């Protein structure tokens, strides 16, 4: 699957052996959740960026029955999914909308997930060629007292993390 095929929805749908009608968005569910932090990070986050605990979860259902999910931090990514964007997306083709950055990060992520699943293609292939076999993960926190940072580093090591990042 090449990028030109992704941009040309008709050839993309044909390439995946799917009817464009199976990519029609029939439902969008949104939920806002308050994410808990462990005690030490919570003290630091409450001091600096308390709004980071709020996230939006979005589930998109396509006419073919495929569901895609996406998530985004309400105050960190490029936008929350508005009621207007939900109304705009319902009834439209997910492959045509998935590149629309105005829809909100969580909805856009859910569209990529649904289109990828509909075509039995990993979502990363919709963005281009795979570059790596694995993705390194870091344990992270914002600045905090030395005692708390030591506790966090020990927890990260115990859980197998090889990198610790502080913001």
Predicted segments, located by residue:
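Metal-dependent enolase-superfamily TIM-barrel catalytic cores that perform enediolate-based chemistry
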Residues: 128, 132-167
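Metal- or metallocofactor-binding catalytic centers and their adjacent structured scaffolds
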Residues: 22, 27-29, 59-122
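N-terminal amphipathic alpha-helix/helix-capping segment at the start of soluble metabolic enzymes
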Residues: 10-29, 116-117, 121-134
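Conserved active-site and cofactor/substrate-binding residues in soluble primary-metabolism enzymes
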Residues: 20, 52-53, 98, 102, ...
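N-terminal export leaders
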Residues: 1-6
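Structured beta-strand/loop patches that form or line metal/cofactor-binding pockets in enzymes
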Residues: 12-69, 73
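A short, structure-level motif marking secondary-structure boundaries and short turns
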Residues: 44, 96-98, 136-139
């Amino acid at each position: 699957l090449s990028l030109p095929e992704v941009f040309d929805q008709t050839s993309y749908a044909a390439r995946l052996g799917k009817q464009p009608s199976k990519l029609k968005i029939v439902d969008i569910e949104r939920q806002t959740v308050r994410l808990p932090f462990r005690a030490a990070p919570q003290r630091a986050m409450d001091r600096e960026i308390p709004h980071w605990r709020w996230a939006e979860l979005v589930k998109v259902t396509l006419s073919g029955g495929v569901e895609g999910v996406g998530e985004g931090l309400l105050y960190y990514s490029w936008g929350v999914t508005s009621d207007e964007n939900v109304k705009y997306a319902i009834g439209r083709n997910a492959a045509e909308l998935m590149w629309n950055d105005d829809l909100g990060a969580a909805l856009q992520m859910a569209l990529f997930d649904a289109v990828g699943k509909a075509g039995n293609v990993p979502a990363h292939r919709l963005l281009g060629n795979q570059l790596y076999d694995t993705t390194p993960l870091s344990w992270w926190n914002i600045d905090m007292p030395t005692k708390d940072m030591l506790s966090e580093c020990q927890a990260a090591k115990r859980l197998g993390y090889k990198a610790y990042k502080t913001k």
